[in-house]
């Protein structure tokens, strides 16, 4: 059974249709939107600030989502896919974004919609990703604009697939 823990008078709010894996941890000031999925060994820790997760978000195995005390919340839009073992910290990820496996997203990063962050990329503090961009590398840099079919076949398709996987578990 997942660990859902209140802290500092804040209790996580889990909306309808959400899947939480048996060993997922959700703590504190967290909202998880409808039809989202939080997979195995994931920690979402809203103990020092707020974490707001939109609808149809998939947070894959081993991901850590956190924020910074008195400084940065973490806000994740709708239809976002966060790949296995990524670290999401004190940033804003807008709608229809794919975060690759093992990527690290640091404080005050803003990722606009319809963007892809490559596996293993490190977005350092304050990086701004404009809509429709591919960022990769350490530190991550703009590589190119995405093609419409990449948005459809990578970002949208991954989010749709995880909604299907969610149905197998709920």
Predicted regions span which residues?
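Short proline/glycine- and basic residue-enriched helix-capping loop/turn segments at helix->loop/beta transitions
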Residues: 81
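Glycine-rich hexapeptide-repeat left-handed beta-helix
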Residues: 1-13, 47, 53-55, 61-62, ...
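Extended, small-residue-rich solenoid/repeat segments and analogous flexible loops
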Residues: 1-37, 43, 168-170
């Amino acid at each position: 059974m997942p660990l859902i823990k209140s802290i500092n008078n804040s209790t996580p709010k889990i909306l309808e249709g959400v899947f939480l894996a048996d060993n997922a941890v959700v703590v504190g000031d967290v909202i998880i939107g409808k039809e989202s999925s939080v997979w195995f060994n994931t920690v979402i820790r809203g103990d020092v600030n707020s974490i707001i997760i939109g609808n149809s978000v998939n947070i894959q195995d081993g991901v850590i989502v956190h924020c910074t005390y008195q400084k940065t919340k973490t806000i994740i839009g709708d239809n976002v896919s966060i790949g296995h073992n990524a670290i999401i910290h004190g940033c804003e990820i807008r709608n229809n974004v794919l975060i690759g496996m093992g990527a690290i997203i640091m404080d005050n990063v803003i990722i606009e919609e319809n963007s892809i962050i490559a596996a293993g990329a490190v977005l350092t503090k304050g990086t701004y990703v404009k809509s429709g961009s591919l960022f990769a590398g350490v530190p991550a840099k703009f590589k190119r604009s995405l093609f419409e079919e990449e948005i459809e076949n990578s970002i949208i398709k991954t989010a749709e697939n995880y909604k299907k996987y969610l149905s197998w578990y709920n």
